[in-house]
Amino acid sequence: MALKEIKTGYFAKTKVYSDNGYKPYSISRITPKGCKCGEIKDLAPSWELLKGYKNGTITSGDYTSKYWQMLSSKDVEILLKEKLITLTPEEKGIVLLCYEKNPEDCHRSILASYCNQKFNMKIEEYDLQKDKDINKDEDKDEYEQIELDLSK
């Protein structure tokens, strides 16, 4: 049996991930309406942390540190492995989703780093270039408006 993968990505490409054999899961406080994905809200940063970071009262370093503290109080490894064992043989793995297009601007890259260091779990950003030919009709992000609304 092939090992199942854990990838990260953003909501706008949920259909791409699903169409290519990955089961999507939201790791955000709010999942966009109509998004066909499961949820792991325990991996989302707190509202206070998110708001502080977005409006500049918390630095990037503090955000990372506080998010790591939050993750260390959760059973992150168990939460992720529970999702992996529910996959069908045809499914390649799971994709952990949030809003930011750029993974460096987002908690999903912090979560991936945390899992790599704490549990030796290899979690990488989903490579959309690999599936470019399959999805060439999808030039516009499905949830572009939501991303704009959150950035205000």
Where are these regions (language model features)?
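Residues lining hydrophobic/aromatic ligand-binding pockets adjacent to catalytic sites
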Residues: 1-152
